[in-house]
Structures are given as structure tokens and as C-alpha cells.
UniProtKB/Swiss-Prot annotation:
Pathway: Porphyrin-containing compound metabolism; protoheme biosynthesis; protoheme from protoporphyrin-IX: step 1/1. It is found in: Cytoplasm. GO terms for molecular function: ferrochelatase activity; metal ion binding. Its EC number is 4.98.1.1. Belongs to the ferrochelatase family. Fe cation binds at residues 203, 281. It comes from Zymomonas mobilis subsp. mobilis (strain ATCC 31821 / ZM4 / CP4). One of its GO terms (biological process) is heme biosynthetic process. Coiled coil: none annotated. Catalyzes the ferrous insertion into protoporphyrin IX. InterPro entries: Ferrochelatase, Ferrochelatase_AS, Ferrochelatase_C, Ferrochelatase_N. GO terms for cellular component: cytoplasm. This is Ferrochelatase.
Amino acid sequence: MTESNNPLPISEKIGVLLVNLGTPDAPNAKALRRYLGQFLSDQRVIELPAVFWQIILRGIILPFRAPRSARAYQKIWTNEGSPLAAITKKQAQGLQKRMPNITVDYAMRYGTPSISSRLEKLIASGCRRILLAPLYPQYSAASTATVQDEAYRYLQKIRWQPNLRSLEPYYTHPAYIQTLKKNIEDQIKALDFKPDSLLLSYHGMPVKTRELGDPYYFQCQATSQALSSLLDIPVITSFQSRFGSQKWFTPATDMTLKELPSKNIRNLAVAMPGFSADCLETLEEIALQGKSTFLEAGGENFAALRCLNDSEESLAMLEILVNQGLSGWLKSGE
């Protein structure tokens, strides 16, 4: 083998790929149909026989849901595009500044930039060790596992695979809990009212997933318990974003918001600890729909708190988590 076609790199670089759920390319029905078609075709997300489900998805769900979802996205779309994509990009850029000796990039499980395209880019740049970092504090097969599935689908296609690791779920990691605590307390202090309670709303899942062994529900409860022990405010846990006819985790966030005013909780703050960046579920489902539901039920004051996003505290937390994930790869002092 000549020196010119020797595949060995001069130095082996380390890459980190931050991954979040995904977003459409534009807030219109065509883009939403494409995005939702990819998302809802993932059998980690919809655990039904593919042939049966695709008939329902393509014939019934997408024609109706895509235009409705497009209208929801239009309410939160910014000059930078999708908030989730813009924030995740900033998280990667911020982490890169904090960790200049590694290469940091970001990808989306559904939509763009894809996991495969960013893995290809990292490998092409010389990264032979890559940390896959799904930005989901709580593990679920429908979120964390499908990110790993997609990464390994790409690796199956290449001859010289890099060493790939995945960031562990961090649902009770001290850095995560302390960062959430500060984020919540700082925002509550800045409100012009005093909340009677804090609602912690997580993305919901079908009860069946828990029965099949998915730890997500219990990890959400563990996060709430860890936070509650540190906060000087009553904490309530609920689950949002129900979809389909299956039985989902309870209590449901929308029903909880309807019921709280009748329980003398009329001043409410809502945090969403399972979301690492603000997105449709936080900005539209909670901040807009949730607020309307709560006030119409007799609530007086409502605040949807920002996610950790790309704040300095969030970036410091990510640096801690990534450093632990890279244990044994980084040289002392890097």
C-alpha cells in the first residue's frame, strides 16, 4: 500500500454529535407531511404492524394532521427557522467553544440535518471516536433507542467504523438537577406573581411501553422527585402530547390544567424538564394552548418556563456530561 492511499489518519480526533428529535424544514403542510411521515413511520414510535399502520398513516392521519401541525408551527416559527433546530445548533456551537480539542456537531433524528450526514462529516474530518449524545435526560425506546438505531444503520454501510459510544441518560445526574433547579428558581423569581404550584410536564407515552419494560415513566418520576426535594414550592407531575386511542400515562397535562383551578391552584408555573430545548411541545402546546386551557378553567396567572436551551448553565452542564461520556478517551488536561 502506498503512502497516498494509506487510510490511517495522522491523528485520531474525537467527535461529539448532539441529537434531538427533529423538526420540519418549513411551517407548511408539504414539509409537515414529509416530516411527520418519517417520524410516525418509525416503529420505535408507533409499535404497530407496518403495513397496517402505513395505510392509516398515509390515508387518514397525514392528510389531516399535516395542515393542523403546520398552523401550530407557524405560531412559533422565527427568523432563524424552527426554534428546536436553532437552539440545538447554538448548543453545539457553545459546547464547541468550551471544548476546542474535540469536534462538536448536531443532528436531528427526523428531518435535517440527519444523523447519517453528520456522522459521515465527522468521520471524514478524521474522527475515529464519536460520542453520540441524545439530548433526552430520560431514556425511552421511542427517543434514545431510535437515535442509536439510526446511527448503527449508517455504520452498517461503511467498512471502517469508528468507535461509537452513547451518552447515558442523565435524569438524576447532579449537574442536570442543579441546573434545572437554578433555571426554574431564577424564572420564578422574575415573575410578577407567586405560583401556588409548579407543574412538571413531560412528554407522554402509551402505558403499554411501561408494561413492556421501558424505564421512561419511572425516570420522569425520579427527576420530579429529585427536583421537588430541592425546590421550595409544591410540585405536580403530568404527561403531555397524547396521540391516538391507546391509554397513555396519567395524569394528562391538559386535564390537569383544567382541574387545578377547582383545587384552588390559580397561579401556576409550568416547567418541562424532559425537553432540552424549547420546541413545538413547549412553545405552542404548553405556552399557548396550555395557558388558554388553564385560564378558561378559572386560573388567574400562568407562566410557561423556558427550557435549559443554550444558556451558560446549560452549556456547563452539557460539558460535564460529555466529559464523563468521553472518560478514557480524553488525555489529561483536555
